Amino acid sequence: WSSDVCSSDLFDKSRNLYGLNFARSSRKKEIILCEGYMDVISMHQAGFTNAVAALGTAFTSGHGTLLKRYTENVILSFDSDEAGQRAILRAIPILKEEGLTVRVLDLTPYKDPDEFIKGLGAQALEERIRKAMSSFMFQVKVAAGRYDQDDPESKTQFQHEAAKLLAT
């Protein structure tokens, strides 16, 4: 079985989530959405059976609809690199459109859940999950990083962007 499998009439990658068969019967109130299936395997081995991932494809509205059937709360646990952060920013509006409450897990200084668990352990990850930031605060944090807060004009541009985020 490969994540490179194409979608067909019988199988649609944009409407399936790896690990959902376990996550939907988890006793947790939220589902943790990971970037890839290897992250899900690591999470499950560490006891986080509420972790899922898109199957080798970008996160879609079909995935959002599927998650909505099983939870009201999603925690995004994507890689802490730039690509992972961009993927989080793309996933947030899809999940919000479904009416889901979205929080973002901070894995720094580690790249992904597997490295985090190996470095600090499952208990430390549980604590990070408990303290996961709201999607709005994550978006504001990312936006703030794009502006020079010491420059008045740049700071004003950031404030306008933050106001737009608040209005959505």
Where in the sequence are the language-model features?
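Phosphate-handling DNA/RNA-contact segment within nucleic-acid enzymes
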Residues: 3-70, 74, 87-88
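Short glycine-/small-residue-rich flexible loop motifs, especially phosphate/cofactor-binding loops
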Residues: 40, 92, 163
